């Protein structure tokens, strides 16, 4: 009896072991299938990532190609500008070809890509180039208010004859109103005949072709955002025109006055700088007034302004490009700003004061003053 019970016990244990073995084998097969499926998913994911990587590399190569083309274009413009700077105080003849630095606009303004050669309309110019300083003044119609004659009188009368010989003042009429252009040209030729004849004073105008159609729409002419966008484009076109003419470019506006001997002080200060690492010099703290750039750097500035011309006013973009070019990645902004004095140089006291009260934006008044003037 005892032996029988033992045999039954062994049989029961054997059945349990067999069942457990079958269960384990079944689970192992399921696990193996899961592992195979998992491996297939991993391989599939790896293949997808590889395709994405190849696509990313292709896009990266395309982007680098575009940037390379832009860099070549900028280098060509800079070399062309250098050829002009070698001709100190020279006058361009009618047979000399101007560098087509305006082609860069086609990269950023799609409506210009089918246009031919781009260049502002010349109202009056003797083609002066190879001087030390180009002073750019952008102007638009302010209705019954005008400060341009006062500005030009202040800027030109406070130059010595030698300083006039070494500079060019460019008035850019950035207004679609043809009658305003005619009134500016008439005023300039009447009140500043000597400077026009000597070549120190030029007047250009920006054809409507340069602007996107949305900015020419009547509905946007009184829109503040559109006005700011157009102002960025106006300044960029003026910078490109002035670039091959001088070693330095000074941005002014059409409603300012200059201090006595401003030109002498500006020239002496620039020549006294021992460091050549400066980014730009501020001869006024207001907006974009009195900002001095090296002409060879203008291409980089214009590229940046055109990339973001629809997002911010130009004086804010100037702050942005300063932070991008000077600040180290990951560096606290405060630490960067402490080092800015060597790159963004501020001259005191300011050499220019804002005098206009009627803004170039329709219907707006502004009473901004430079407290350091």
UniProtKB/Swiss-Prot annotation:
- A GO BP term, please? negative regulation of protein glycosylation
PTMs? Isoform 2 is N-glycosylated; consisting of high-mannose and/or hybrid glycans.
**Lumenal face: residue ranges?**
27-373
Which InterPro entries does the UniProt entry name for this protein? Glyco_transf_54
Kindly list every residue the record annotates as glycosylated: 29, 54, 144
Write out the transmembrane intervals.
6-26
The segments annotated as topological domain Cytoplasmic are 1-5
Q: One GO cellular component from the entry?
A: Golgi stack
Tissue specificity here reads: Isoform 1 and isoform 2 are specifically expressed in testis. Isoform 2 is expressed in spermatocytes but not in spermatids. Isoform 1 is expressed in spermatids.
* Similarity field: Belongs to the glycosyltransferase 54 family.
Instruction: Kindly give any further remark recorded in the entry.
Output: For isoform 1 inhibition of MGAT1 activity is demonstrated in vitro upon forced membrane-association. Its rat ortholog is the most abundant protein in testis Golgi preparations.
Its protein name is Alpha-1,3-mannosyl-glycoprotein 4-beta-N-acetylglucosaminyltransferase-like protein MGAT4D
Which source organism?
Mus musculus
Lineage, uppermost ranks? Eukaryota, Metazoa, Chordata, Craniata, Vertebrata
């Amino acid at each position: 009896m005892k032996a029988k019970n033992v045999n039954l016990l062994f049989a029961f244990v054997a059945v349990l072991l067999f069942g457990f073995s079958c269960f384990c084998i079944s689970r192992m097969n399921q696990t193996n299938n899961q592992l195979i499926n998992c491996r297939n998913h991993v391989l599939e994911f790896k293949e997808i990532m590889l395709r994405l990587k190849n696509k990313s590399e292709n896009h990266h190569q395309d982007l680098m190609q575009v940037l390379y083309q832009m860099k070549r274009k900028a280098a060509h413009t800079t070399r062309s500008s250098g050829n002009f700077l070698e001709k100190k105080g020279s006058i361009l003849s009618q047979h000399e070809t101007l560098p087509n630095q305006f082609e860069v606009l086609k990269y950023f303004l799609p409506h210009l890509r089918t246009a031919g050669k781009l260049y502002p309309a010349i109202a009056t110019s003797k083609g002066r180039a190879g001087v030390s300083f180009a002073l750019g003044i952008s102007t638009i119609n302010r209705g019954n208010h005008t400060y341009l004659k006062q500005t030009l009188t202040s800027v030109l009368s406070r130059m010595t004859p030698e300083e006039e010989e070494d500079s060019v003042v460019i008035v850019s009429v950035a207004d679609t109103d043809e009658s305003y252009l005619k009134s500016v040209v008439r005023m300039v030729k009447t009140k500043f005949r000597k400077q026009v004849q000597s070549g120190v004073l030029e007047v250009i105008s920006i054809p409507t072709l340069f602007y996107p159609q949305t900015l020419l729409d009547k509905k946007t002419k009184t829109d503040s955002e559109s006005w700011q966008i157009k102002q960025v484009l106006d300044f960029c076109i003026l910078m490109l025109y002035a670039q091959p003419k001088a070693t330095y470019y000074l941005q002014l506006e059409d409603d300012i006055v200059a201090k006595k001997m401003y030109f002498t002080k500006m020239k002496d200060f620039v020549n006294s700088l021992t460091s050549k690492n400066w980014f730009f010099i501020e001869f006024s703290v207001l907006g974009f007034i009195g900002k001095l750039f090296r002409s060879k750097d203008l291409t980089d500035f214009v590229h940046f302004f055109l990339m973001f011309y629809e997002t911010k006013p130009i004086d804010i973009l100037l702050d942005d490009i300063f932070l991008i070019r000077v600040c180290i990645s990951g560096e606290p902004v405060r630490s960067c700003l402490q080092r800015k004095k060597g790159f963004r140089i501020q001259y005191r006291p300011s050499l220019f004061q804002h005098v206009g009260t009627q803004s170039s934006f329709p219907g707006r008044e502004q009473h901004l003053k430079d407290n350091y003037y």
